[in-house]
């Protein structure tokens, strides 16, 4: 709306919004910035890397998941070798609240409970949990979890009711307050997890994006496969032979798999030019999913996974945290990286002795009136709302998935303060709105 401000800079425009007087566009000389980024990203991984490195091994006897090992460092108040920049938090101060209170694994607890309250403000869209990840990808269970905590020493299945804590559906699992060692016994918001900003895997995948943008396809593929080999524990799931848009799409997806819940995906989508397209795709998929749940009792994804309307759950004796799933037929171990800490051993008040949640039917359809369902109920399992609640609340979900996008031509608008330099040089033509400062 003020073209004279841009001087000789030219833009490639995807779409425009006359009402908001804005455009979804990129500079025509964007590859110059890719070249600059390539130099800095390569240095961050080599000459300027210092002691930082991708965590590719796991020395723990009870787990073999280098991806999770990175996050465990942070929960133990240590600096991971993979961390490049984090905002430091101090234990037992309110400034430490973000990943131990706002964004971690959901809990109904309060202060000094088992465990404390966690709002779980980051949720995974169910279609991505069920239909996005390869079932062999070790990142899925570390990144997202289907059970939360009641604050009284017990694990319990999340609901898809609109809400927080144990409502709201599948949530971020990279930071689980139960896994802190030593466990923080104190008031909520005080566990002291640092706030992550950038890590080595992020840099590797940004460099892959840059390489693909500069047509260095072989190098881009090699970078992506570094991340995939860690995620799967082998090279059998490596990508190969991709170029052009197919390669760029693969890199975009890899960043989603790797960086879920770390604050990158929306900006990745904006930068890719696919924000509005992806928003409409996921909403359409969720609409179809909800309809199938209502009419068929389940929804089947292209990878063969099934999201059912109901699951069967049972509280079982003991209190243990689980790790990589070694037996998918064990209803306590599958999916992995859930369970509950034995809070009674810490002297905290707990309810009962059956603290772990066994789940049957999470990835398959069990007809409620079937012989299988009857057998499970005879064993003490309880028919539990799962996808049925999601279907009943689908309008709430659809209105909150990338809101404001109404078509693939919509312009995604993010409001950032206009820098003082721009305001001062605009001769009064540019000002910050929304109550933002002018200087």
Model-derived regions: residue spans:
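Extracytoplasmic/secreted proteins, especially bacterial periplasmic and envelope-associated proteins
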Residues: 32, 36-39, 43, 135, ...
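Elongated scaffold/linker segments in the mid-to-C-terminal portions of large proteins
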Residues: 50-215, 272-439
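Generic secondary-structure boundary/loop-capping signal
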Residues: 81-82, 141, 195, 233, ...
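Active-site-adjacent helix/loop patches that line small-molecule binding or acyl-intermediate pockets
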Residues: 252-262, 266-276
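Structured segments of extracytoplasmic/periplasmic soluble domains
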Residues: 40-51, 207-213, 223-234, 250, ...
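Short, surface-exposed recognition loops and adjoining beta-strand edges that mediate ligand/DNA contacts
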Residues: 2-105, 233-250, 267
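Aromatic-anchored glycine-rich loop motif in surface-exposed flexible loops
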Residues: 1-29, 178-198, 207, 212-214, ...
């Amino acid at each position: 709306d003020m073209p004279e401000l841009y001087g000789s800079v030219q833009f490639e425009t995807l779409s425009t919004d006359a009402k908001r007087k804005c455009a979804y566009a990129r500079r025509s000389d964007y590859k110059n910035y890719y070249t600059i980024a390539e130099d800095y990203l390569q240095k961050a991984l080599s000459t300027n890397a210092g002691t930082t490195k991708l965590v590719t091994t796991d020395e723990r006897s009870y787990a073999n998941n280098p991806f999770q090992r990175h996050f465990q460092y942070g929960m133990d108040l240590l600096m991971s070798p993979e961390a490049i920049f984090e905002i430091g938090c101090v234990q037992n101060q309110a400034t430490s609240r973000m990943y131990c209170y706002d964004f971690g694994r959901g809990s109904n607890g309060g202060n000094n409970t088992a465990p404390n309250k966690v709002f779980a403000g980051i949720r995974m869209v169910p279609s991505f949990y069920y239909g996005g990840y390869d079932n062999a990808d070790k990142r899925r269970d570390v990144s997202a979890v289907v059970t939360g905590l009641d604050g009284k020493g017990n694990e319990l299945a999340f609901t898809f009711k609109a809400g927080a804590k144990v409502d709201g559906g599948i949530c971020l699992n990279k930071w689980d307050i139960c896994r802190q060692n030593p466990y923080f016994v104190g008031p909520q918001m005080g566990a002291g997890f640092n706030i992550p900003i950038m890590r080595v895997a992020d840099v590797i995948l940004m460099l892959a994006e840059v390489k693909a943008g500069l047509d260095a396809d072989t190098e881009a593929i090699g970078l992506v496969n570094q991340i995939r080999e860690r995620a799967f524990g082998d090279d059998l799931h490596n990508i190969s032979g991709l170029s052009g848009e197919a390669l760029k799409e693969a890199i975009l997806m890899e960043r989603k798999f790797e960086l879920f819940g770390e604050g990158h995906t929306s900006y990745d989508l904006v930068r890719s030019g696919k924000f509005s397209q992806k928003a409409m795709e996921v909403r359409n998929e969720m609409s179809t999913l909800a309809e199938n749940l209502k009419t068929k009792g389940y929804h089947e994804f292209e990878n063969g996974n099934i999201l059912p309307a109901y699951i069967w759950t049972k509280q079982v004796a003991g209190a243990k945290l689980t790790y990589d799933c070694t037996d998918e037929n064990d209803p306590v171990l599958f999916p992995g990286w859930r369970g509950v800490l034995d809070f009674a051993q810490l002297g905290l008040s707990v309810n009962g002795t059956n603290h772990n949640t066994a789940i049957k039917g999470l990835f398959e359809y069990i007809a409620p009136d079937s012989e299988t369902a009857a057998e499970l109920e005879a064993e003490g399992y309880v028919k539990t709302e799962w996808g049925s609640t999601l279907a009943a609340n689908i309008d709430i979900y659809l209105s909150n998935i990338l809101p404001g996008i109404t078509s693939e031509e919509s312009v995604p608008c993010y409001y950032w303060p206009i820098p003082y330099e721009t305001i001062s040089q605009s001769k009064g033509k540019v000002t910050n709105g929304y109550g933002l400062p002018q200087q």
